[in-house]
């Protein structure tokens, strides 16, 4: 058979997307958002085109929003930042026979698994065809570990200018990877001389996921019981144990395995219901309703709770008193009541949760939603909000399905919209976690 000629003009292009009902589960997946994939839990904002939402918020002409917790201000796209992002997603310009070009990008998938384990995931392949090739083949440079089914795409009909072909594929990993594995989509055609020719028209990178790339994070979940002040005759306890599955699936996107220790059962929790000192952390909100405030005098709520928690541990076993000191353990205190703070102007801010600058503590409110805890845990692992200008990349606030956005501010129907992490966030948070033992 004649030798294949490479890099001839393409007449189709192929892109990888998550499975249709993906909600951040099964794997981490990142791609250049172009507004072509409907994310069911984030209607109208999920997959907003990065070209339109990469930029910065300005509080006045030339002055970038300085507060990493706020997205207020005029938003302006940043072409330089977007070009940097295009490089990150490995932009490739495919040339059609008539000289026109189409831009294509590499997608990335992260699969959390252990050595000698086998895992199969489902993805979608999105293809646009101007002229039908002889075949569209999926080839992997690590076929000893990576299996692809089907390895040939079946729908090759011309659809340029119309609806893309969407086909589900299964990728089976027979073991972990110590280096990236590339799945390339190869368009096989016949050139003008009747010779077979091929061109790469799409690419997916499976990121390395062996032991040296997997990390862990030790997290202590602590349920706190407060005095009765919300109309109940008994004090409320925070639910510290009910949301672990979502925490696990989100951190697994970054190849981080959370390792929980819990003080959150009916018998083990931090009881502050009769604690005299805790009364100074009970204030009235803007509606004259009592709530827990994040600061009293010179002591943050988390520091006060930790001091009391250490007393509780010492009473249980003196050897436990200092077990959780330092940053090796992330301590998370869960309250059942509302949590508030005061802004610089004295106005009340309602909090679903917060993390401390020393990356040691997280505090959760009774108003927390599905993604609040892991949002705060990821802050503790070094990730800023997506709309923070000091992040590696900055996105328009409330326009993504990212866990580090404030998308839930759009309304209750978006409470489950924050499901994903970007590849650069995988790398940053993973680098701040602890090696797997």
List PLM regions with ranges:
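Active-site scaffold of zinc-dependent metalloenzymes
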Residues: 328-367
């Amino acid at each position: 058979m004649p030798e294949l000629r490479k890099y001839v003009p393409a007449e189709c292009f192929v892109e990888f997307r998550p499975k249709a009902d993906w909600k951040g589960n099964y794997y981490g997946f990142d791609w250049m958002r172009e507004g072509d994939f409907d994310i069911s839990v984030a209607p109208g904002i999920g997959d907003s085109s990065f070209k339109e939402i990469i930029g910065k918020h300005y509080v006045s002409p030339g002055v970038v929003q300085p507060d990493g917790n706020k997205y207020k201000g005029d938003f302006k796209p940043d072409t330089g930042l977007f070009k940097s992002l295009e490089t990150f997603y490995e932009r490739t310009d495919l040339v059609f026979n008539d000289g026109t070009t189409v831009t294509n990008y590499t997608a990335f998938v992260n699969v959390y698994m252990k050595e000698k384990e086998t895992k199969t995931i489902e993805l979608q392949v999105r293809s646009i065809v101007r002229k039908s090739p002889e075949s569209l083949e999926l080839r992997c440079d690590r076929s000893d570990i990576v299996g692809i089914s089907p390895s040939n795409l079946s729908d090759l009909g011309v659809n340029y200018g119309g609806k893309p072909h969407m086909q589900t594929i299964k990728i089976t990993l027979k073991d972990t990877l110590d280096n990236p594995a590339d799945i390339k989509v190869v368009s096989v055609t016949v050139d003008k001389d009747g010779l077979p020719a091929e061109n790469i028209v799409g690419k997916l990178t499976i990121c390395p996921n062996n032991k040296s790339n997997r990390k862990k994070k030790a997290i202590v979940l602590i349920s706190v019981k407060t005095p009765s002040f919300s109309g109940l005759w008994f004090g409320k306890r925070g639910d510290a144990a009910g949301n672990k599955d979502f925490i696990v699936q989100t951190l697994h996107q970054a190849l981080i395995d959370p390792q929980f220790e819990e003080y959150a059962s009916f018998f083990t929790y931090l009881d502050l219901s009769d604690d005299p000192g805790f009364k100074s952390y009970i204030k009235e909100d803007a509606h004259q309703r009592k709530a827990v405030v994040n600061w009293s005098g010179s002591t943050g709520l988390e520091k006060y709770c930790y001091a009391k928690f250490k007393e509780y541990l010492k009473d249980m076993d003196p050897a436990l008193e200092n077990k959780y000191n330092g940053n090796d353990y992330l301590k998370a205190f869960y309250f059942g009541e509302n949590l508030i703070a005061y802004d610089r102007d004295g106005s009340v801010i309602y909090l679903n949760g917060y993390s401390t600058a020393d990356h040691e503590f997280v505090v959760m409110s009774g108003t927390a939603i599905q993604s609040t805890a892991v949002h705060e845990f990821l802050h503790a692992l070094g990730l800023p909000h997506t709309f923070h200008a000091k992040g590696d990349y900055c996105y328009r606030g409330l326009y993504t399905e990212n866990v580090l956005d404030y998308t839930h501010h759009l309304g209750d129907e978006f409470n489950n919209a924050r499901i994903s992490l970007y590849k650069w966030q995988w790398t940053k948070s993973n680098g701040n976690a602890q090696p797997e033992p």
